[in-house]
Amino acid sequence: MTDPIPEGFEPHFRKSPLTDPWEPLYSRVAEKSVSIGLRLAKPHTNSRGLIHGGLIASLADNAMGYSCSQALGWKVSLVTISLAVDFVGSGEIGQWLEVECEVIKTGATLCFAQSLIKADGVTVARANASFRVVTKKQ
């Protein structure tokens, strides 16, 4: 039996060559944030069988960027200016990994966000990022 996907999550709405190997990804869209989640599997791990820090950092960056886009009404594009991640635990194959975001401040040229990354509800990392707001390409 496959573990269920938590309530409110649906197949992720955006595909990317970077995240294709990590599929299936799921997202939950709220009024001012986007959470990303996935069931941890072998391709998500390092040589010790634990979740890879690069996966955590990349998903946090994506989720915080989407959250800023959501807060700004999806009318602009964003590029990451800075990203910091503190690793405080680890995740294992089979656990549900979820990136929960909060947009701290939006402006005409910058957006700031933070996130907690949890494996089965236990915090394994925290991250924060700054994004440059740019005109969306038509």
Stretches found by the model and what they are:
Residues 1-138:
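Terminal targeting signals and extreme-terminal segments of soluble enzymes
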